[in-house]
Amino acid sequence: MIVIGAGPAGLSAAIEAAKKGLKPIVFDENAKPGGQLFKQIHKFFGSKEHKAKVRGFKIGQELLAEAEEYGVEVVLNATVVGLYPEKEVTVKVGDKVKHYKGDAVLVATGASENMVNFEGWTKPGVIGAGAAQTMMNLHHIKPGNRILMLGSGNVGLVVSYQLMQAGCEVVALADAAPRVGGYGVHAAKVARCGVPFYLSHTIIRVEGDDYVTGVVIGQVGPDWKIIPGTEKHFDVDTVCLAVGLSPMSQLLKQAEVRMNDTKGGHVPVCDKYGATSVPGIYAAGDVSGIEEASSAMIEGRMSGASIACYLGYMTEEERDARIDELEGQLDTLRQGMFAPKNRGKLVEKTEEGIDVSMNLLNKGYVADDEIERFPGVTHQKGIHPVIECTQNIPCNPCQDACKKGCIRIGKNITSLPAIDPDKKCIGCGMCVASCSGQSIFLVEEDVEEGYGEVTMPYEFLPLPEVGDKGVALGRNGKYVCEAEVTKIRTAPAFDHTYLLTIKVPNDMVMKARFYKKEA
């Protein structure tokens, strides 16, 4: 079995097949295996079976350890330059080109970043979001100091937050689309840090002679053309582009696999087993359609099981039982507001019939007069969680984290979290640290006369110290009141998410959502 690509899909497929007795060999053009996982320092969504609340790079480490355990051979710095219908590949390793013939081939080459053409787009300082992640999270280099992000999908939102974690200033986030494209919880944690969102805006030009010194954006109309007089200038040294991905399917086309043009790119036509139109050639992960890494790992396992059956290492009954199990996991991830069937559509109500926050879609944060309508936001005496998760997304770690049963989601993991008023919160903070979207806060009024406390997730360095005085910012990233740090907690179970507690006036405990130290 030959696997092309040592990312989440490729490694998962190789492991699945190796468990059944196959001897997979995996080729990857990079110096390290793991694909995009090692760039991803954020916690994943989903449930336990999807590695929810585990950081991406740790999932990568687990996959590599499992691949080693089952004897998967991984060849690095090896670029596959040819794939042929007879299940043959040519691989460039150093100065040599080698030829391999397999009994089955899985293509898991992933995707490449899209670019946008505008005046000055080739200047040094214009980079892709993936490049920014590589610089920060693999090489520990700041991509720039003042950055404008173009793109409000999950990649743009997550990378914007990581840029701030790396010490960069994100001066604005723009997107030509009229609505935020990614998860609202990702947008909210960027907005409360003070980053303004400019929806229905795109880049007109980048300024600077030899490198980026500024950028001009403008508002687009219904015809996607710039509206005269709407230009806005920002002093920046870096422009980061997060405008989608395209499947890297060239090898599949070379192998004469039947392809399909979709809005997501040029993808192979595959059956439920990952099999293409060419017998013995399979595809999994982003090369067969752009999704999250969690989905890619499941697709990889499905293809690995299918190849094991194709080569006689599993019966069809065993394969189908395994595929049914994995399909169930995959279907779970494809539910909710961001399900494939809803792409490009405006979903106006949650599954519970609650009006979605238009402010969240248009500005990146839920307005104060909207937040109260959601079931995770309640007023109680004593310390209690406030869950500002307002969209149906597949995620339930908060329910599992609370050992007192204060939080309930139910069997459908896309249901909005709700608070059980009959259960007593003990303020352990496990729900706060476990929330992949950082949307849970602990609130308590009357800690002392006229003042309450808000406990929030915090992942920035340097950490504030107890006694520090600063300001509390609201959901919109603007000043709401003075604040004092009263507690900072950490624990191995929090996985580097600190719990920062600030003291604010009682009437601000439902508004203060971020702490900023006084300059």
Q: Predicted regions span which residues?
A:
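Iron-sulfur cluster-binding cysteine motifs and their immediate structural context
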Residues: N396-I413, M430-D446, R475
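Residues forming the flavin
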Residues: M1-Y365
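Short, well-ordered loop/turn sites that connect or cap secondary structure elements
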Residues: L463-E465
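Short, solvent-exposed secondary-structure boundary/capping segments
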Residues: T490-V504
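Short, surface-exposed secondary-structure boundary micro-motifs
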Residues: A308, R475-G477
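Short beta-strand-centered aromatic/proline hotspots
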Residues: K478-P492
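Ferredoxin-like iron-sulfur electron-transfer modules
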Residues: M1, P228, V287-I290, E351-V356, ...
